[in-house]
Amino acid sequence: MNLLIMGLPGAGKGTQAAKIVEEFGVAHISTGDMFRAAMANQTEMGRLAKSFIDKGELVPDEVTNGIVKERLAESDIAEKGFLLDGYPRTIEQAHALDETLKALDIKLDGVINIEVNPESLVERLSGRFICRSCGSTYHKVFNPTKVEGTCDVCGGHEFFQREDDKPETVKRRLDVNIAQGEPIIAHYRELGLVSDIQGNQDIDDVFADVKKAIAAIK
């Protein structure tokens, strides 16, 4: 069984990916792991990727696509199947993946799309704040301090928010992800591969829906 998992940052995609891998025994292929392995093993594409990263440059699509192809050609994929996580990120990469799968004679069985309302994601992702004295991390909704305005760990009263966690920054990041993701989802929807999963639920309820979707695919 060969699957792709998609979802916006904060939608719980990583959590569900880990559960799918544990439950179904497929190979978990994440972009970060692929890059690290390719560079550590000094594959042709790994060496190319490292040359760009060492210069502080973005790795071009051709190299990223090549690393994915190298990974999908490994023997465990034929044995176990895969869950691809974090790729494709653009419609161009999606088309490149189509070509790679065709060249390797691999069939993509389904796309699990974790859907969460972007407004609730802004709240989820921008709620983090940090104690200036000791660095302890809290969340306005999910992990507040026991006493408002006082750090549980050191008793400090000064907190700050990282630039990346501010609502306007989070919203901009989500807007970019939505703009990139919509044509990819549309592409796979045309192929009849997408299963939409409501992500605004308890983690176990989300996974119950994921399992139902996978059972329908199988």
Swiss-Prot record:
Question: What is known about its subunit structure?
Answer: Monomer.
Q: What positions does the entry give for ATP binding?
A: G10, A11, G12, K13, G14, T15, R128, T137, Y138, Q201
Query: Its Gene Ontology biological processes?
Result: AMP salvage
**In which domain of life is the source organism classified?**
Bacteria
This chain belongs to which protein, by name? Adenylate kinase
Q: Which PANTHER family match?
A: NUCLEOTIDE KINASE (PTHR23359)
Pathway per the UniProt entry: Purine metabolism; AMP biosynthesis via salvage pathway; AMP from ADP: step 1/1
Name the principal localization, coarsely classed.
cytoplasm
Species: Streptococcus thermophilus (strain ATCC BAA-250 / LMG 18311)
What UniProt notes about the protein's domains is: Consists of three domains, a large central CORE domain and two small peripheral domains, NMPbind and LID, which undergo movements during catalysis. The LID domain closes over the site of phosphoryl transfer upon ATP binding. Assembling and dissambling the active center during each catalytic cycle provides an effective means to prevent ATP hydrolysis. Some bacteria have evolved a zinc-coordinating structure that stabilizes the LID domain.
Annotated EC: 2.7.4.3
- Any one GO molecular-function label of the UniProt entry: ATP binding
UniProt keyword annotations, A-Z: ATP-binding, Cytoplasm, Kinase, Metal-binding, Nucleotide biosynthesis, Nucleotide-binding, Transferase, Zinc
| HAMAP family to which the protein is assigned, alphabetical | Adenylate_kinase_Adk (MF_00235)
* One GO term describing the cellular component: cytoplasm
Catalysed reactions, as listed in the record:
AMP + ATP = 2 ADP
- Region (NMP) location: 30-59
Q: What class of enzyme is it?
A: transferase
**What's the name of its gene?**
adk
Segments for region (LID)? 127-165
What are the binding positions for Zn(2+) in this chain?
C131, C134, C151, C154
Can you say where in the cell this protein is located? Cytoplasm
